[in-house]
Amino acid sequence: MTAILFWCSLVVVSSVYLTIPLVTIFADSFKVTPSQAAWAGSAFSFAFAGGGLFFGVLSDRYGRKKMMLLGLLLLTVITPLIGSVSSFSWLVALRALQGLAASMFPPSVLAYAMEMFPIKRRVTIIGFISTAFLMASIVGQIYSSFIVLNFSWSYVFYILFAVYLISSILIAFFIPNGKTQQPDGSFFSPFLRIGDIFKRKGLPLCYIISATLFISLVGFFTTLGSYLNSSLFGLSHQDILWVRAVGIIGMLVAPFDGRLVAKFGVKKVLCCGLIFAGIGMGLLGLWPNLIFLVSMSVVFTTGIALALPALISLIGRIAGEIRAIAVSFHMFMVFIGASLGPILSIYLINHGGYLFTFEVLAGLLCLSLIVPFFIRLEEPRS
């Protein structure tokens, strides 16, 4: 079951990053500017962020498995249509619909893991799912780049039809049903509980870290890519992608978070992850050596991979019975951070250079390190 949840999380979230290597291809194919072509990614991201909050709340009412399966089935229908469009407006519209469909999965799978696995295994399972989320940022780009080099951009989406169909079958037949709350009240009743997350002491503080982690992660990818493409290194976009791929090594630590949390506690593991990420980010720009940069990028991604599962576990523990809503808001804040990351990084690069950008992002991680000290943990809620 863990392998299925890992696989489905990877292929769903990879769709967020598919169009990053395709921007110039879309610009040429549809005769639009690169900034307009970037809307193929932005439309997905905005729909994914908003939809995650909406559907995560509904999973409380209708069940986690139903929401995961519905999302995958809709992806199976919508995704191949994207490959067949001849209008850029339709491309953007269908990518937005794809984002809404994909947004049904992440908050549901995280809430499912928290409910269906015993406490001792919970952080480990969340670690595997978090690893899939993090790896998706690289795997999605590598996949679409490989397909475009060998076929055409349309096949990026045609092939995913089969991937999502197989994933739907796996969820339908090999994943047991989760818990479903009794549907009391109207359809909109669950949404009235969103305000409850701000009444739980510590949850709003957790969301500061949620945003900061992904401002740093996406800012890291943006700044590192520009840095390696500069005259100092002169790497091609394909070479840069492989440098980023090395970061997967650091992400592989996430499944071991459960053992670390059991031994040291969730807050200590979270702080340790933030320290690792801050050190890796802070040292990145100090020495313009490719091997050193790659090494520090692994340190950085190791820190993120340690911090993210611990943070999700902490949110679930504080939230208790409203964990689905709490995790949905976490995903919303994650994508707010992911949207702000490139904007902040480009601004900092233009006004202060690469070293300055790395240090500011490291500073954000260091500031977020203070936050866990203001979070008090009570006995775990059911």
Predicted regions located by residue number:
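Helix-loop-helix hairpin linking two adjacent transmembrane segments in secondary transporters
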Residues: 90, 119, 128-175
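Helix-breaking motifs and short loop linkers at transmembrane-helix boundaries and internal kinks
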Residues: 31, 63, 84-90, 118, ...
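Conserved MFS/SLC helix-loop-helix module at the cytosolic interface between two early adjacent transmembrane helices
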Residues: 50-86
